[in-house]
Amino acid sequence: MQWTLVVPVKPLARAKSRLSDTAADAVRPGLALAFAQDTVAAALAATAVRGVVVVTDDPLAARELTALGARAVPEDPGGGPGDGLNAALRHGAALVRDVRPQSPVAALNADLPALRPGELTRVLGAAAAFPRAFLADAAGTGTTLLAAAPGHGLSPAFGPGSRTRHRRSGAVELDLTAVDSVRQDVDTGDDLRAALGLGVGPRTAAAAARLLIPGQ
């Protein structure tokens, strides 16, 4: 089964505010872009992935991620400023299904800089057995991937505590080991240290090398 992934990227100037203890205001936009670039590059290298649709209103992110082979689309112009992440994912999934009605679709976080193509393929392979499925994040409270098989809506419920919401929505939680790179999103300095320990992509490695991160 070949999946199309929807990856939401918020405006870089507002991204990763919780990394303020690790990265200065002037540095965080570049770090967020590096996370997204390494995430998208790894996703496109996964054998289970047909393509990646990036939903963003940030022109730099759109340009850089398109250069990697993703398709960048703006957020839904009919959506209000408070509609946020889940509206962007619904919009991206709808665009995918407009072109390929029977395509399996998965939402993937943009902040998985240690992502391994083989681990992502394994997660998507497991998800293919269910109408909807999700993978919890490393912290055990959120979600890094939500998948919907052909004929089923994505119905995203991302945000704090999304693991519980996705489970209550009927999505099956994937109980997989050895897929740490798909679970390790980066919101805090501790998350970044954990991702660096797994081994991040080249753009994140270069950006992180300019930071003083204790323990690295």
UniProtKB/Swiss-Prot annotation:
UniProt keyword list: GTP-binding, Nucleotide-binding, Nucleotidyltransferase, Transferase
Biological process per Gene Ontology, one example term: F420-0 metabolic process
Stored InterPro entries: CofC (IPR002835), MobA-like_NTP_Trfase (IPR025877), Nucleotide-diphossugar_trans (IPR029044)
Enzyme class: transferase
Pathway noted in the entry: Cofactor biosynthesis; coenzyme F420 biosynthesis
EC number, UniProt record: 2.7.7.105
A Pfam family hit: NTP_transf_3
Key word DNA-binding present: no
Catalytic reaction(s) noted: phosphoenolpyruvate + GTP + H(+) = enolpyruvoyl-2-diphospho-5'-guanosine + diphosphate
Gene3D superfamilies for the chain: Spore Coat Polysaccharide Biosynthesis Protein SpsA, Chain A
Residue numbers binding phosphoenolpyruvate: 143, 159, 162
Keyword tRNA processing attributed: no
Gene Ontology MF terms in the entry: GTP binding; phospholactate guanylyltransferase activity
Described function: Guanylyltransferase that catalyzes the activation of phosphoenolpyruvate (PEP) as enolpyruvoyl-2-diphospho-5'-guanosine, via the condensation of PEP with GTP. It is involved in the biosynthesis of coenzyme F420, a hydride carrier cofactor.
Family, per entry: Belongs to the CofC family.
Annotated protein name in UniProt: Phosphoenolpyruvate guanylyltransferase
